[in-house]
Amino acid sequence: MKNFGENDTIVAISTPPGEGGIGIIRISGENSGIVASKLFKCAKKDLTVENFESHKVVYGKIVDEKGNVIDEALCIAMWAPNSYTKENVVEIQSHGGALVVRRILELALQNGARMAEPGEFTKRAFLNGRLDLSQAQSVMDIIKARTDASLRMAAGHLQGKFSDEIKAMRHDILEVIAHLEASIDFPEYDIEDVAKDEASAKVRSIKNRIEEMLSTFNTGRILRDGLVTAIIGKPNVGKSSLLNTLLREDRAIVTDIPGTTRDSLEEYANIGGVPLKIIDTAGIRETEDKVEQIGVEKSMSYVQKADLILALFDTSSDLTKEDEEIINLLQGKEGIVLLTKNDLSCVLDIEDLQKRLQGNFKYMQISTFNNDGIKELEQEIVNRVYSGTVKQAEGVFVNNVRQANALKEAQKYLEDCLNTIEMDMAEDFIVIDIRSAWEKLGEITGDTVDEDIIDQIFSQFCIGK
């Protein structure tokens, strides 16, 4: 773990770069008040930042080393432990011009603070016990949330809903360990069989709880990162029109000329609370245009990566050579086949298409001209994400790979523990497996995680958070 010293005072700009109404500079550390006092001067000359009352807003001016006024600003001191990092924190709110915010940052650096690493404020909150590791990761999930459902899930994690489940399971595991170790330490009481029976019942219960949590991973991941959705079809089948319809804006150029979309477009859409990362691919066909060829190759690769495939076929015409290429590409896959242009006379032999296209596909008819079938498509997407097993963004979700892997490993140790009990092996061997499960669950909250993993997690944060 990177170690810059526990008494370091750090500073960073906490608002996005560029122009805005307000810019926020955040300072954290034992000497944050001293650093801020050297550049923030309030109207009362005998009042300095280190003497501010905690959580009170004070008006003043930013001055440089020569006494020149840089800007008018507000300053808020939040003294330890009642702050985000549980350290002394000072936030300066200036006008949001890029130059003035950068100048205030430079003054803080000149007066004893150092530049914060990415995520270092939240990392300090974790190290100081303000948040556990799962809650810390949810901070970035809140920042990146694209739908209300995503935000509710992230906010629930920040409040500790997910962590509480993990901690409860770890507590139950400790009870099992205590009973088993008691039977080891006090063999004269002849409680070995009772301890094993109790351990077996509790371990099965915990294992089932982990299995339930893992069943939410796909939904949680999608709410966090978005459902990668590839729109596939031949040129001029209506892919860009569908993209614009789902986005509810004209993002993609729509013409009657095949090959208008020569590269893939990526956009996010909110479909019933589900964030869709929609990829409008180039129409798949043979072409002499090198740029379009690259686009077609990318389209084919997106079919392999996508969480959901929307395959478009034009009902107003017979299957073409380009359609045949789409059919071959999609063999054995699953997704939704959209029969487009159903506002026109149907020429396509749909039964023939269903026979040719082998895979798990739901067939739906749509028209982007009159929006026929669009609501049904959106509901189908939502149903696929939630699978009818959970209420939308309610309860606890596993939403990242690190958490899922730790749960899977803990589950494996619990399975080994049950096998050890069934083989009637000594309690010492049972304790080894169940303690390993306890440690794996601790990696989720950060109680037993390696320092390198902590560094890697917080390096993904933005500077200033």
Where are these predicted regions, by residue range?
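Noncatalytic alpha-helical scaffolds and linker/capping helices
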Residues: 274-277, 282-286, 291-294
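C-terminal-of-GTPase-core extension/linker across diverse P-loop GTPases
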Residues: 2-13, 17, 151-270, 287, ...
